[in-house]
Structures are given as C-alpha cells and as structure tokens.
Amino acid sequence: MRTPPVNVQTTNEVRNTNIVFFQGDCFPIISTTQFKAGRLKDFAHNWKKLTSDAFILDTVQHCHIEFKQGSSCDQHNVRVQKFNSTEQNIIDAEILRLCEKGVLEETTHCKGEFISPIFTRRKKDGTYRLILNLKEFNENVEYHHFKMESIQSVINMVTPNCFMASIDIKDAYYSVPIAPEHRKYLRFKWKGKLLQYTCFPNGLACCPRLFTKLLKPVYASLRQTGDEIVPYIDDSYLQGDTEQECWQSVKKTALLLQDLGFIIHPDKSVFLPKRVLTFLGFVINSIDMTVQLTPAKANHLREACTKLLNAQHPTIRDVAQVIGLMVSSAPAVELCMLFYRTLENEKIDALKENHGDFDARMELSASAKSDLQWWVDNVQQSEKKISPPNPDIVMTTDASKQGWGAVRDHHTTGGRWSPAEAEKHINELELKAVFFALCSLCDNVRNKHIRILSDNTTTVCYINNMGGSKSRACNIIAKKIWQFALERNNFLSSAHLPGTQNMLADRESRVFNDRTEWMLHQDIFQKLSLLWGPFEIDLFASRLNKQVCTYVSWKPDPGATAVDAFSILWDRKPFYAFPPFSLIHRCLQKIIADKAEGVIIVPMWPTQTYYPRLMSMLIQMPRLLPRKENLLRLPHSQKSHPLWKKMQLMACLVSGIVSKQKEFQKKQEESCCSHGENLPGTSMASISKSGNNFVVKGTLIHMTYL
C-alpha cells in the first residue's frame, strides 16, 4: 500500500534532527540549532574525499580574499553612522544573534585593518539581514568573470509533467570560514565595540564566485550519477521524470550537503516531489509548461509601477529600480522585453543629461507611461510558456537597398522603398520588410505561431528579444511588429536562414514591375477630389502610389485594405481608379455589375472597344488632364512616363446605375447647342474635328480641361 507523503517531522528517536518521510522512505535533516559559523572546516576530511582542488580545500578550511595586484587596502576615512532608536534596536538584536552563531567576534584595532559601515535589509519573513557595506573595500578585491546558474537554467531543464523539488542551505555564506589574517578587512564599529566577521559576509564582492566555485564539485558528483540539479548560490533545484527519481535526487543531495558541513533549511526547502514548484520567486508548472511570478512578487512589481506612474517627477534612481524589477520578472512575463525598453531608453537619456546623477529628476513620456500602465494592468495575469508550440506558419523575408520581399507558402510579395526609406540602415530595412510581410501575408491570421526566417542576424535577434538597445530605430520597428502580432493574438519567433537559401524573398526585394506604379500628380488628384470627391478608396494602388489612405493593391501589400480590386464589392464607397489600361474593359463591367460610382482615369483612345461603353456610363462631363511631363511619375524615382507627350489622359465620373446615366444624357440633350458643325445622330462614338466632342447614343459629350 502506498504511504502518503508527510511533511518534515521532529522525532524523539534521533536527537537534534528532523526526519523527512516519502512513500516509506526517509532521511534525517540536521537541526538548524546546530549551526556554527565557518563549520565547513570541521568537515574538511569529507571535502578531501570529493575533490583534490587546492583552491576549494583552502576555501573550505580558511578562505583567503584575493586582492588586486598592487592593492594596498589603505583606508583614509571612517564614516560615522547615525541610526534612529528603531534601527539601533534591530541592529542590536542582529549583532547579538550573529555573535551567538560565531559569525561576528569582538576584536581590537590592528595595523592594516579596514572598517566599513553597516546597514540592514528586511527579509521576506520580516526579519532583518545585517550587511557590511564593503563598496570601498571591494575596489581592492580581484574580479574574476564567472558563470552562475540562473532561473533560466532551471526553466531550460523542465520537461512536460516532470517532478520537481528544492533544497535551501541555511546561512550558506556563514558556513565558509575566513582566514584569521584576513578578518581585519571585514570590520565595523558599533556602540564603542570593534567587531569583525569570521566567515563570508554579505557584501563581499568575491563571495558569489567563491561560493559557486565551492559547490561545483558537489553538483558535478551528483550529475555524474544521473541527478538533474541546478544550483543557485544557496538554493538547489532538483528534477526527475518520476516521483521516485526526484525523491532519490533530493535524498542524495541532502545527505551529501550535510556530510560536507552544510545545514539544510527545512522550512524553505521543498523535499516532496511536485509538478508545480515555487523556486526563486517563480512558480514553475510542468503540467501546462508555464512559468509565473509568485503573487507576492507580481503584487510588488505592480505596486512599484503604480507608484512610478503617479509620480510627477521621479528620480532616475526610482525609474532604474522599477526597470530592475521588470527585467528580473522576464522569465515569467512573456511580453516583458516589449514593455520596458522605452523606460530604459528614457532613463539612459536622463542620465546623460544629468551627468550620471541618479538622484536627478526626470519626466516620463506618454509612451513610457503607457508601458507602465501595461504592467499595472497585466503583470498579475502574465505567464510565459516554457516551450513555445511549433510554428503554424513559416515566412521568409529579405530586404535590399531597392526594396523588400517576402514568401509564405507559395505566395510571394514585395515592393520598392520610398526615396526616404532607401536611405535607412539595412538593419532597419530588414525589420521593416518583416513588418510589411506580416501586414501583407498574415493580416487575417489569428491565434497562430508565425516563424520568420531572415538572413539578417539583427532582425532575428530583435524579433526574438522583442527589441534591442543598440538601435532605437530598430527597436521602434520591432515593437510595431510585435504589436501587430499581438493584436491578432499571434506569437512570433525568428530563425536565421543563410542568404543562399533565401533566393525567392531576395528576388522579390530586387525585381519589380513598375508598369503598375505610375502615379497621378497629387495636385491634379486634389483638383479631382474638390470637383468630384472626396474619394473613400483607391482601387488600383500600392503603398507608395496610393492617393487615398484606404486602398486596394494588385498583390499582397502592407497597407492595403484588400488584394485584387475585382475580389471586393465597389458599390459601398465613392472610388478612385487608375487601372492598368488592359483592365479598363473589365473595370467597366465591374462598375455595372456592382452598380458602383466613382472616377476612373483612362487614356482618350476613341478607337478602343471599351470607349463607347465608357462614354455611355458618364454622369458628368469628362475632364481632360494637362499634358505635362510630371503628370505621371514613379513614386520611388520620380521618373516621368515615357509617353507623356503623346498620351492624353482624361478623368471620367461614371456610374453603373442606368437611371443616373440616362439622367445625365437627358440633360446634355436639353443643353447641347451647335458648335458650327453637324454630327451624325446615329453615331455611337464619333469625334468632332475639334477633338473634344463626342456623340453617344445621339447625345453630344463635350470635354473640357481640368
């Protein structure tokens, strides 16, 4: 029969120990009352069985501080500190507690001593930690770069439905003894007494590296036997595919740590395997594979953001502290990186303006306040997926100095840059290509994971990191990309694709069809708008040559309302159309079918088959457009149309509603008069000698210049 797990219990059978039970198995935990500072030295014989590393054995028995070459550790001034009565009582109690443990000892002055100030920090459990302010002394300590595990190391190890546990070492730093000859550097004064640390203090710069290095052989020996474990200073995360695997890891780790002299904190450890574990302020869930902030941590961050949001002129330090909280929450807040960089950039700018003075005041922009509001509204519900799902859509993009291109499945698109855009850095253009690709090919995609493949490493980095700090311009575009995706509840990821494998998107960014890009001069368009507008949609346009904000493109386009004008109804909005000449006949059919009304720009070619139909659909006299070199130009190069001298364009207000056509024709019959020549009344489309008059179904059509 399966024995239910129980919590840590105190037993009378084993003196000064607790017993941890799990499914009929157990192991002892040494009582925390047994703790004495520097106790690792009493277990040096066990450390020697584990490692022969001289540096580690020295640290275990009498750790020596590593000084910079040539450092003298001279102290010029000893600052006098003042504390209020409440602070004094807290410090008195903490000093007494530390003296009882042997962490502090009373001493006398000696040559070469270094006396530092002290301060306290409130801990989560409401007690206080005494900290030696070694900022000045640390300038003499040798710095070594080292790798320390983080919460991300833990998250990377989590697998679906795995079991997890954690072990917390009690007073971990205080377990490591400081060599007697180096204790004189760790002194402070209190109420006429001179006190010094006998072990690692909180605040010594080399301690995190030394403690991490000290535990390396410990965890290496456990990993060699198959235990999955991640240490972080005094905390250890343990994992197993089954409850028993995880339990055995807990048992082996706890017993080994105790054999080496460490005391395990039973209240802060989680010995019994579980699938939802709180570790380092994060809630790790292997069932749904997510990470969340603990409620306390989320509330603290929300309160900090609210306070900053309400501050009129916060100090730069206030802003920096909130940014620190935001960044530390990143493993559990999916969109963290998207909503902190504006604040970070403004902090950097403010520091430059104030010559590095963190106590100077700054003003937050509307954008920064908007980001803060996002945190206030969302941080308590935020989570982050440990393993994003496989992509549903894969899209390749590319950019050149000429234009952009994109490919999704068998659909391709691309376009030229405007002259101003072409001047931008290629990294900006590559990111803009991604934005245009999403707008063009994924506008209607919802609830999907979209993978972007790019041969530009900056693009990959800025998408995966939701922005970056090196380029403000790239960061702005990256934020637009993500906001576009989030509005559609899509998730983005990016991967690098070698340029040799990105040929289709590359081609789209360099090869263009300019025959569809001719644009009517904006002054002429404005005159037409005043005459017959305003127009609500441009039916044949692109991002660069659109005359109206709402437009339809002939291929996927980042700003288009729709693709292919013939795929939508034209009857709802007064339209402006400047179609390719080969599509004029089809446009007239569409206008009739949809009973639409609008302006169409066409060449005055009476010999074309569509011409009689066009004239019969008029509801206002056509306007001839001036034959000028700049009438038609390509927007990206301002090149003029090669036929501008020979081609006469006209603007026609047409309708697909027969009653409106007949009403216009009737008015012309009533108002027409002779211009000195006779036209055959039966002619369907005859042109007068003046070149500006036509007869359509017996009605004289007189053209005038715009």
Task: Please give the residue ranges for each predicted region.
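RNase H catalytic domain
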Residues: L438-M503, R507
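C-terminal reverse transcriptase regions that engage the nucleic-acid substrate
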Residues: E142, N156, F271-K384, G499
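Reverse-transcribing Pol proteins
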Residues: T11-F146, K193, V230-D235, V333-L364
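Conserved pre-motif C helix in the palm subdomain of viral-like polymerases
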Residues: L98, C162, Y173, L194-D227, ...
